[in-house]
């Protein structure tokens, strides 16, 4: 895990109430992705237009709204791997955690900032402070992140999705 704070991805998303899990993954990948579980279709569309975000939806009716024009993606898969594969294929989103992107809090959607090992040591379990040197923190919820086994699992899953994308290219 490269804990440097590289450039933020430019694409911004808003996910409808059926895509909370996808919103969390996109945030981890560094994409500014808003998500509200309960929001009217009108408010969702208005926010997408006002904030210049692409609407991610599983609702075919929403994609027919004129205000959205080309600012929407109809997500066809029910599973997260299929959803990420579709966005990688259709929008060329980067599914690599090791470079380029800044990272965002999966809960808050706030960009994470690097914190020193000394600052992190008082906020994480002692064995984590002993084992890891690089830490990021959310300025909003104060949650601390480090490149542990969960990060390795995410990386493996994303590598498999990228390989799947290569297998399905013409």
Q: Language-model features: where?
A:
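Short linker/helix segments within small regulatory modules
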Residues: 122-135
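Short cysteine-rich clusters marking metal-coordination/redox-active sites
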Residues: 105-108, 138-141
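SIR2/sirtuin NAD+-dependent deacylase catalytic core
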Residues: 102, 112, 121
């Amino acid at each position: 895990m490269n804990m440097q704070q590289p450039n933020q991805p430019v694409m911004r998303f808003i996910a409808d109430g059926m895509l909370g899990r996808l919103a969390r993954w996109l945030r981890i990948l560094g994409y500014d992705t808003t998500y509200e579980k309960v929001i009217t279709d009108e408010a969702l569309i208005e926010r997408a237009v006002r904030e210049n975000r692409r609407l991610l939806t599983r609702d075919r009716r929403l994609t027919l709204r004129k205000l959205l024009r080309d600012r929407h993606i109809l997500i066809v898969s029910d599973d997260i791997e299929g959803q990420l594969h579709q966005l990688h294929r259709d929008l060329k989103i980067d599914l690599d955690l090791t470079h380029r992107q800044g990272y965002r809090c999966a809960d808050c959607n706030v960009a994470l900032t690097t914190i020193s090992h000394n600052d992190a040591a008082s906020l994480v379990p002692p064995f984590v402070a002993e084992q890891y040197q690089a830490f990021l923190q959310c300025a909003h919820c104060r949650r601390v992140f480090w490149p542990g086994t969960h990060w390795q699992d995410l990386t493996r899953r994303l590598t498999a999705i990228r390989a799947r994308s290569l297998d399905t290219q013409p």
